């Protein structure tokens, strides 16, 4: 058998599919990141080793700002190419919805690099609007205001507009339009109004219900006519500058996008026919990320189109509708937060230990005093072959169930139960090996891989770092960041360190379909073994929660230049004291309470003075230490 090669690992984990030229494997068998076009690589294993020397421990989130820059340029260049090809005579605007990742360093990097592309921001709530207005005071780029609005939200936006901000209040419900008109009159400002339209068209994938008739937001055709009538009566026709639609995040099928664009383009045409000279069409989000690298509409974790195709369809549809009706081309706004940010962050954590189902030693021989069920199951194991494996499997299951029942009634002892257990799993493993080589294996054997997988216990919280994996079964690219020049010899599911049975990952990317286990390597003594989770830059940080009081992980910002990479910033993860403070425990008060208890215990002779000091020292240091295992 030939030696395992790097190319085999590339195929096994499909890194060339989802890596989008940013991720690969080097000759050392380590995952590398190439944030820029100039080809400068960052070896993730060497980066983690360097960070360990700096006392920055895993789990850690590694951010690559250069990838953010590259994503902005890529989308902007796609718009430029499509504009030239289709004779587009208006402007396009890239808008970053900060709900995707509100972390200040991420937003600031996007603003900084996006200035030359006039990149704008979107706020979907009052707190987000406060951030958006203050973080980019010098720019005349667009600010889109979505979400539910009250008087203070609207007043803040209108006063910002009065001071020169290009800010658009997008009406989600009719009552908002009345409120905007009222506040605008009080403040003596002509508001820039947008209206979100509820299209009949919907997206595809996990967020399909975000669009169409089931959409939470937007005005129906009847409500739109009511809004237009209201604006006309209030002498505010000129204030309607923008129409907006959104058919859902991570749209998997380009056909759904084309359908929605055709429908939206007719709303734009009809408004112009009615005398409302709308200038902007905000096509919302939906531009998906190919998480599994299959480029398939059949997968909820993939898309069957490129950024260029998405942009081409957006521009060509609106240009065609405008030209046919003799109206100006609209300025096109796209809110593609997921596509901008997903690739720039990598979560890295260490495997702490493993657990494997028991199996019988190969040299085991049944003894005269062993229970008859042990004899029967041993015979099945000893004579197992392909021709009778289905019958053998059924017999093994029956024997196991009978043994468990007898144990529960006190008829067989613990030793017998353990023997049955080891023999049963040995039979199961052999049947799985035989079935995996068959072209058409019986259905009942298809889940044996999942059943037999090892458990790799990892130092991270699924709920804090990968909430979408738990909540909506989102599949992220996951693979070891080292030893990729070695053939994986185990298959495992990943378990986090929360006290929750849901804290596990059991769905992974494979070359053809979703796999229920991940190919990994056996641990080598005390050598650290790291797993990387990729494309986690969208939503995961901000949606994460503190289940079991595990806080934010360490975060590291890494940039590259011609000389290599540099660690620009290290943001310490949350301490135990910080997360306790969130849930209204005062760390200082906790220490004082324990000091009183320890003093009392010393006086009662339960512990010595030295033991009391040691206990308090450990408690204090633990309070101000990392929430994860160190």
Swiss-Prot record:
UniProt KW Metal-binding keyword: yes
InterPro entries recorded: Ala_racemase/Decarboxylase_C (IPR009006), Arg_decarb_HB (IPR040634), Arg_decarbox_C (IPR041128), Arg_decrbxlase (IPR002985), De-COase2_CS (IPR022657), De-COase2_N (IPR022644), De-COase2_pyr-phos_BS (IPR022653), Orn/DAP/Arg_de-COase (IPR000183)
Pfam families for the chain: Arg_decarb_HB (PF17810), Arg_decarbox_C (PF17944), Orn_Arg_deC_N (PF02784)
Keywords: Decarboxylase, Lyase, Magnesium, Metal-binding, Polyamine biosynthesis, Pyridoxal phosphate, Spermidine biosynthesis
Listed pathway(s): Amine and polyamine biosynthesis; agmatine biosynthesis; agmatine from L-arginine: step 1/1
SS bond list: none
Sites where the protein binds substrate: 281-291
Record field: catalytic activity: L-arginine + H(+) = agmatine + CO2
Gene3D superfamilies found in the cross-reference section: 1.10.287.3440, 1.20.58.930, Alanine racemase, Lyase, Ornithine Decarboxylase, Chain A, domain 1
GO annotation (BP), single: spermidine biosynthetic process
The protein's enzyme class: lyase
A single MF term (Gene Ontology): metal ion binding
Enzyme Commission designation: 4.1.1.19
Modified residues (N6-(pyridoxal phosphate)lysine): 99
Name of the protein: Biosynthetic arginine decarboxylase
């Amino acid at each position: 058998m030939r030696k395992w090669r790097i190319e085999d690992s590339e195929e096994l984990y499909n890194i060339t599919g989802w890596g989008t030229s940013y991720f690969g494997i080097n000759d050392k068998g380590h995952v590398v990141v190439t944030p820029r076009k100039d080809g400068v690589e960052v070896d993730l294993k060497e980066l983690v080793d360097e960070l360990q020397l700096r006392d920055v421990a895993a789990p850690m989130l590694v951010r690559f700002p250069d990838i953010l820059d590259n994503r902005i340029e890529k989308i902007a260049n796609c718009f430029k190419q499509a504009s030239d090809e289709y004779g587009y005579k208006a402007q396009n605007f890239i808008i970053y919805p900060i709900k995707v990742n509100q972390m200040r360093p991420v937003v600031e990097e996007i603003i900084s690099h996006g200035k030359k592309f006039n990149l704008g921001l979107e706020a979907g709530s009052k707190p987000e609007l406060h951030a958006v207005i203050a973080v980019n005071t010098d720019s005349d780029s667009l600010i889109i205001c979505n979400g539910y609005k009250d008087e203070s939200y609207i007043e803040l936006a209108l006063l910002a507009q009065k001071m020169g901000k290009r800010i658009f209040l997008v009406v989600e419900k009719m009552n908002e339009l009345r409120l905007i008109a009222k506040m605008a009159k009080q403040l003596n400002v002509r508001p820039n109004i947008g209206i979100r339209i509820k299209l009949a068209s919907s997206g595809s994938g996990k967020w399909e219900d975000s669009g169409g008739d089931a959409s939470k937001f937007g005005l129906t055709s009847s409500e739109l006519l009511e809004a237009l009538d209201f604006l006309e009566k209030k002498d505010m026709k000129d204030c309607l500058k923008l129409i907006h639609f959104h058919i859902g995040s991570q749209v998997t099928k380009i056909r759904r996008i084309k359908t929605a664009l055709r429908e939206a383009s007719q709303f734009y045409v009809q408004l112009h026919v009615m005398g409302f000279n709308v200038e902007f069409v905000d096509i919302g989000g939906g531009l998906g990320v190919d998480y599994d690298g299959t480029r398939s509409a059949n997968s909820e974790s993939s898309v069957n189109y490129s950024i260029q195709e998405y942009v081409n369809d957006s521009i060509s549809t609106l240009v065609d509708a405008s030209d046919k009706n003799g109206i100006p081309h609209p300025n096109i706004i796209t809110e593609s937060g997921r596509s901008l940010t997903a690739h720039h962050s990598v979560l890295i954590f260490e495997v702490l230990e493993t657990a494997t189902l028991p199996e019988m030693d190969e040299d085991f021989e049944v003894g005269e005093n062993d229970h008859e069920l042990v004899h029967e199951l041993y015979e099945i194991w000893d004579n197992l072959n392909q021709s009778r494996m289905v019958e053998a499997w059924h017999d093994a299951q029956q024997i196991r169930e009978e043994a468990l029942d007898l144990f529960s009634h006190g008829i067989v002892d613990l030793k017998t139960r353990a023997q049955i257990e080891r023999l049963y799993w040995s039979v199961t493993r052999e049947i799985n090996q035989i079935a995996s080589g068959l072209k058409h294996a019986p259905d009942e054997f298809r889940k044996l891989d999942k059943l037999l997988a090892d458990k790799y216990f990892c130092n991270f919280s699924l709920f804090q770092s990968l909430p979408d994996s738990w909540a909506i079964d989102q599949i992220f690219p996951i693979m070891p960041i080292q030893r990729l020049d070695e053939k994986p010899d185990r298959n495992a599911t990943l378990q986090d360190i929360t006290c929750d049975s849901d804290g596990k990952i059991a769905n992974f990317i494979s070359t053809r379909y979703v796999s229920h286990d991940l190919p990994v390597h056996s641990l080598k003594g005390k050598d650290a073994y790291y797993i990387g989770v990729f494309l986690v830059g969208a939503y995961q940080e901000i949606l994460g929660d503190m289940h079991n009081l595990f806080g934010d992980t360490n975060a590291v910002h890494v940039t590259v230049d011609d000389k290599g990479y540099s660690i620009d910033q290290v943001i310490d993860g949350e301490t135990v004291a910080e997360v306790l403070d969130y849930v209204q425990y005062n760390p200082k008060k906790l220490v004082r309470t324990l000091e009183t208890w320890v003093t009392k215990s010393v006086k009662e002779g339960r512990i010595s003075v030295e033991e009391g000091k040691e206990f308090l020292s450990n408690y204090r240091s633990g309070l101000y230490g990392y929430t994860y295992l160190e």
